[in-house]
Curated annotation (Swiss-Prot):
Residues 74-83 have a biased composition (Basic residues). Probable RNA-dependent helicase. Functions in cell growth and proliferation. May have a role in ribosome biogenesis and, consequently, in protein biosynthesis. Belongs to the DEAD box helicase family. DDX18/HAS1 subfamily. A motif (Q motif) lies at residues 187-215. Its main location: nucleus. It comes from the Eukaryota. One of its GO terms (molecular function) is ATP hydrolysis activity. It comes from Drosophila melanogaster. The gene is pit. This is Probable ATP-dependent RNA helicase pitchoune. Residues 1-168, 659-680 are annotated as: Disordered.
């Protein structure tokens, strides 16, 4: 029997008892006066009623009389009182009473605790003494109905809350959690704080113990705190923010009609797909909706799915801003949590302006999480903009001696420019049965080496930013599922990607800075108890970079390499490039892009383009005479527009309009009406 029914039964018994006592008193008076008894018609006493501080609303009294019509209740004079302020909108007024009364009695008490920020006077504690209740002739206060954190459908139009409705807020139901680094790091210790459906999914994924970043961040995140997390690559940051996101949506009972409650921003398409894959496994036993939007996908299909309602959304920055500005059916006003993964990478690739616009468009009352492998001044500035409350900082490896994981064996070899390709070919030929990733500095360099190695019977695959999205996706999953293989890639694959069992990371072209080096080598030795190897090729003039790596806590040893065992294919390479027109054109573009990328290095005192021997560099691309490179053209192409607003190609046309007046005539933006007139 529920609390409400118990209170009603007490009320009925008390009133029947009062009626009997009243009839006995009248009978005694009639016997003394020897007058015939009068029919009182079951009228209640005219004793003035006392008005309780905690009153019952008129609509709830009507519900009580409908449920218990067989027990006649005395008519009471209702006194109008202003309704209590409530910060939560009740969902679906059409079925609010029927659905609530059919739920289990055991869930009644726990559900009352899960209601967020209801005024204290609206809920009766039920702890008043029975004697005090019998002495006072007043209505018993009925506990407030269970309310759901859903928009009021009767007061909303087109899925948008009415103006009079206050935005619903989140009060964590995990008040019993204490922020502490518990010795028990098993996921089973989260029982009671995390739903059974989530724990079952984690177990099916094969995880039993939490990593350090997970054990330190899960408790405050489950309590609704803002957090800035810094940990090494492969330390389990993805689950650290996905578990609280899923639990938040589950606690609030989000439905598709409520729109998007959690947004997760990732820097690249591959990382977005990987995060979405982990989320899919974690949501195996939940009924909430989840989706992925990213550049290269069909925007119209994404917009239609957003209109139907996606509770947890994984997105890249540019496409997310496009939907926020141009998809009218995208309901994000009920957003409860914003998660930004690999923040430093997002800022490095030029999406700082997009992030600021996204943060300004989203609701201010939300939980925010920022995760990255490194912390910089730009991240701190973004944290002040995105995090309104005092965030918790969790730096897992701040006090460690090394910035890379323990199972990683890393080193370098000093190689002159003309021998670089021969060393790489020999190394890949020897390790072709292992899983190897090779990093280049430009897309054209990846494209050329991919064509060259496959032409000379060394099977390799490639991922770079100029590929179509379908090709990138197919290659990524093929390499993930393969037991061995060679992947040539740019830094698009250097952040966050969890590719299993990578044996070697080869950095053919030097990274921009130590942070980029850390992210590249983080693709191997991921997880506890795993091992991996990393190799960095350096010119003799670049040895000063080791000082920066040492300052960044990156231990590097020089690897021994037998120069007598290098495959001497230089003559065959030069003949092939001279005869094959397509390889020749690809090699020219790769050479130019390599020199331009070298010129754009941040550490110019180490990577100085003036120290490059272009004749020796050209030999590594198969040329006897180096092609002409215009560094000014490269610099102009590397410039980004001052401000990317997202959608409509604004940044593209703004860049094209810079220059002569003739160009402005050709690339001037026009609206739809002007475009129609022009077409006529």
């Amino acid at each position: 029997m529920s609390i409400r029914e118990k209170l009603l039964m007490k009320k009925i018994v008390k009133r029947e008892k009062m009626k009997k006592e009243l009839s006995q008193k009248k009978g005694n008076k009639n016997a003394q006066k020897q007058e015939p008894p009068k029919q009182n018609g079951n009228k209640p006493s005219k004793k003035p009623e006392k008005l309780s501080k905690k009153h019952v609303a008129k609509d709830e009294d009507d519900d009580l009389e409908e449920d218990f019509q067989e027990a006649p209740l005395p008519k009471k004079k209702q006194q109008k009182q202003p309704p209590k302020k409530q910060q939560i909108q009740v969902a679906n007024s059409d079925s609010e009473s029927d659905d609530d009364e059919q739920e289990d009695e055991a869930d009644e008490d726990s559900d009352l605790d899960e209601v967020a920020e209801v005024d204290e006077e609206d809920v009766d504690s039920g702890s008043e003494d029975d004697d005090q209740q019998e002495d006072e002739d007043e209505e018993e206060p009925v506990p407030a109905k269970k309310t759901k954190l859903l928009p009021n459908k009767s007061k909303a139009q087109n899925g948008k809350p009415a103006k009079d409705d206050e935005p619903f807020t989140v009060e964590s139901s995990l008040a019993a959690l204490d922020y502490r680094d518990s010795d028990d790091r098993s996921f089973a210790s989260l029982k009671g704080a995390v739903s059974e459906a989530t724990l079952r999914a984690i177990k099916e994924m094969g995880f039993t113990e939490m990593t350090e970043i997970q054990s330190k961040s899960l408790t405050p995140l489950l309590k609704g705190r803002d957090l800035v997390g810094a940990a090494q690559t492969g330390s389990g940051k993805t689950l650290a923010f996905l578990i609280p996101a899923v639990e938040l949506i589950n606690k609030l009972r989000f439905m598709p009609r409520n729109g998007t409650g959690v947004i997760i921003i990732s820097p690249t398409r591959e990382l977005s797909m990987q995060t979405f894959g982990v989320l899919k496994e974690l949501m195996a036993h939940h009924h909430h909706t989840y989706g992925l939007v990213m550049g290269g996908s069909n925007r119209q299909v994404e917009s239609e799915k957003l209109g139907k309602g996606i509770n947890i959304l994984v997105a890249t920055p540019g496409r997310l801003l496009d939907h926020l500005q141009n998809s009218p059916d995208f309901l994000y006003k009920n957003l409860q949590c914003l998660i930004i993964d690999e923040v430093d990478r997002i800022l490095e690739i030029g999406f700082e302006e997009e992030l600021k616009q996204i943060i300004n468009l989203l609701p201010k009352r939300r939980q925010t999480m920022l995760f990255s492998a490194t912390q910089t001044a730009r991240i701190e500035a973004l944290s002040k903009l995105a995090l309104k409350s005092e965030p918790i900082y969790v730096g897992v490896h701040d006090n460690q001696d090394t910035a890379t994981v323990d199972g990683l064996e890393q080193g370098y070899i000093v190689c002159p420019s003309e021998k670089r390709l021969l060393v790489l070919f020999t190394f890949l030929k020897k390790n072709r049965k292992k899983k190897v990733m090779v990093f280049f500095s430009s897309c054209m360099s990846v494209k050329y080496h991919h064509e060259l190695f496959n032409y000379i019977d060394l099977p390799v695959t490639s991922i770079h930013g100029k590929q179509k999205q379908t090709k990138r996706t197919t290659t990524f999953f093929q390499f993930c599922n393969a037991e061995s293989g060679i992947l040539l890639c740019t830094d698009v694959a250097a952040r966050g990607l969890d590719i299993p069992q990578v044996d070697w990371i080869v950095q053919y072209d030097p990274p921009d800075d130590p942070r980029e080096y850390i992210h590249r080598v983080g693709r191997t030795a991921r997880g506890s108890g795993t091992s991996g190897h990393a190799l960095l090729l350096m010119r003799p003039e670049e040895l000063g970079f080791l000082r920066y790596l040492k300052a960044a806590k990156v231990p590097l040893n020089e690897f021994e390499f037998s120069w007598q065992k290098i495959a001497d294919i230089q003559l065959q390479l030069e003949k092939l490039i001279a005869k094959n027109y397509f390889l020749n054109q690809s090699a020219k573009e790769a050479f130019k892009s390599y020199v331009r990328a070298y010129d754009s290095h941040q550490l110019k005192q180490i990577f100085n383009v003036n120290t490059l021997d272009l004749q020796a560099v050209a030999k590594s691309f198969g040329f006897l005479v180096p092609p002409v490179v215009d560094l000014k053209v490269g610099a102009a192409k590397r410039e980004r527009p001052e401000k990317r607003v997202g959608g409509g190609g604004f940044g593209f046309y703004k860049k094209m309009n810079e220059g002569s007046a003739s160009k402005q005539r050709h690339f001037k933006q026009v609206n739809r009406d002007q475009a129609k007139k022009f077409m006529r």
